[in-house]
Amino acid sequence: MGLRKADEKDITLIQKLAQSSWRSAYPSIIPVEQIEYMLKSMYSDDEICNHMKNSDFHYFIIENNKQEPVGFIGFEHYFEADTTKLHRIYLTQDAIGHGFGKEAINLVKDHTLSTLNKRIVLNVNKYNPALKVYQSQGFHIIDEIVLDIGNGYVMDDYIMEYIF
């Protein structure tokens, strides 16, 4: 099990991992049309490349013991004052429940401590089973939000926080 820093050569891999994760995890939560809309807008080459050009935004590829990619994370330091935002953490279906998510969250915590940020925030769909994982890792719900993301779709999320 390991994590490696992603770079522009990994954009296609990140897109494939996102597609695999979203298409298996979200159909019971949001319409398939919304999944495809969000994948297209949030995981375009330009979107990921712009993140990678931001020195405070980091992507890591999550690998299993055979060094095969099973997921990724994306987080941004200084998203707000004293705050790191965990934007993305996704695993392939077969990687869920094997500690990869916890390891990735610990990496974000370690990186956040090195910046002297005092908290990590994330948004999670209110019906996403990952909510329990975040809670088990010390995150607490601090708010809820319904975001209009265009094309008639919304994200109905909890905002969660981890404080150091």
Specify the residue positions occupied by each region the protein language model found.
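Extreme N-terminal starter segment of soluble prokaryotic enzymes
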Residues: 1-3
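Acetyl-CoA-dependent GNAT
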Residues: 5-11, 16-94, 105-111, 115, ...
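Conserved glycine-rich acetyl-CoA-binding loop
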Residues: 68, 88-106, 125-132, 136-137
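Short coil/turn segments at alpha/beta junctions that flank glycine-rich nucleotide-binding fingerprints
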Residues: 98, 115-118
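Accessory recognition modules or surfaces
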Residues: 102, 154-163
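Conserved catalytic-core motifs of GNAT/GCN5-like acyltransferases
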Residues: 121-125, 135, 140-158
